């Protein structure tokens, strides 16, 4: 301790000598203001190195009275060691311990705040706070080199001034700074201003808790997030984390973002929703010191593959949500217990998922795609469906062909129908087809075997759709037939007055939509077998009806329907018909508007449907009110084929054109040509779509690459 005091005293001597020397006038001071300014400087030095009264008592004689003049420091210069020993050293000894551990006075055992030992400091001065600014290595290196150019005595003086300021409490620091700033000239003040502008910046993301940092980053768009990741390694870990990009995927994938207007192609929404809880928990336990994969999300600690599915997006994107979920459900039981390599290689970070979807979405927007043509049928292609790398097509040549979409190779041909095939649908295990020979056939499409044949219609089958255990078929005989695979029951839905061209089953609400040549669309209740609602508006035969996913959102102020030219009728009450005709909204719940057969516990049918007709138009409807929200104009002839999801509508018509529409604005985004005959069928996926035509060809447009 004695050596420390000795070094402090030596530093004090040199620093006082330095200060006195710096304050020496370079010439005779004649102006009163200059004399007054120098007198203030002397008083400030005396306040640091000792009171004027103590010094005066020792040297205040008649002979040396001239030393009290502003331009003379002779007396002060003769006793630097005494003044430093008396004032500077005690100042440092008193304040330095309190600067780094303010637990009370050194002479007492009283603790001021055990829970927060640095409670005396603001958030910028607390030594234990993470946001305390680190030293700037280039600046400090430059400062060191400039300091070394000065004489040793000047170096010690400057260093001791720094020590005094560093040891001073906050109140003292403000006084010192105010005194220094008062003596600075304009160039010096300009230098201070430029320097402070950079010094007052803090790394707020590092200082805040991780969950708050993630909350801030979730407000940024993708461009800003990518720029934030370039700031530092810490920012990169935060900006690239699954917590942020899961939210970005949730906001954009399979829906239009209300902020930026962007929507990205389909993703398994079920997994996206299920993983939300895991992501929220992860945000509160995030640690940058963890493994590098923590930010990217390649590592998982879930004990079972089910948990992995809820956390990570499967590496190989697919085109249909339902089929993917079914495939995983059927294969999880036989899947071995996964290890860490399984997670790392099979599941990607959400940022990679978003990047892949964004690339596909951009290709959709600008029409960048590759085209593949499938030739093999000898008559017009009337129906098709694709899933992963499998494409099934049905034709008026009475055959069904199975294709490999990657190679374009024809895998097999299914033969058995006696007339043209108008409709088909397949899943992992079976393919069901409907033909003008009045029959439906169930096939094992992997082997080509016909498993069973169903007859029940008195006319050709021109439309079918199955969901879970319910199959609906539409026929030339003006009826819709419901087949229940579970209890083997069947029944007919009668009401249309002309051919029924298309049907769609919604097992969630236990309802069926049907489109007919009588220019109407009907909504049926499978429980009561009653028609809940009839949609009028088309002036041509309605060829297709497609319910939109429940995630689809439409702003009412965007509606531009002409209610004078459309109407809807309900199978229950006239009041509902009048209300829907006028476009008024009911005060009842969404389910009750469909009649007493719907109780509060029964899910409502899909809220929006899209229809196409031979009047060359496409219409968007709201099922709860029966309103036509939008009419799409652009095709020159009747629209035969239709596909839709939450982001777009794809239509094919007699005019041999395929058009892509924005369902919210009604704008035609792009038109594709290439077929030499009417476009009769369309299949739509997340990154591609396929069209079939009476020219016997199938064309597939891929936006993936």
From Swiss-Prot:
Domain of life: Eukaryota
Keyword field: Repeat, Transcription, Transcription regulation, Ubl conjugation pathway, WD repeat
A matching Pfam family: F-box-like
Tagged with keyword Repeat: yes
Biased composition (Low complexity): 33-42
Example GO biological process: protein ubiquitination
Alphabetical list of SMART domains matching this protein: FBOX, WD40
WD repeats, residue ranges: 376-413, 416-455, 457-493, 495-536, 588-631, 634-671, 674-705
Residues in F-box domain copies: 202-248
Keyword Transcription found: yes
Extent of Basic and acidic residues compositional bias: 1-12
Renumbered residue ranges of the record's region Disordered: 1-42, 55-80
Protein's pathway: Protein modification; protein ubiquitination
Function recorded in the entry: Component of the SCF(sconB) E3 ubiquitin ligase complex involved in the regulation of sulfur metabolite repression, probably by mediating the inactivation or degradation of the metR transcription factor.
Family designation: Belongs to the WD repeat MET30/SCONB/SCON-2 family.
Assembly and interaction partners: Component of the SCF(sconB) E3 ubiquitin ligase complex.
Protein name listed in UniProt: Probable E3 ubiquitin ligase complex SCF subunit sconB
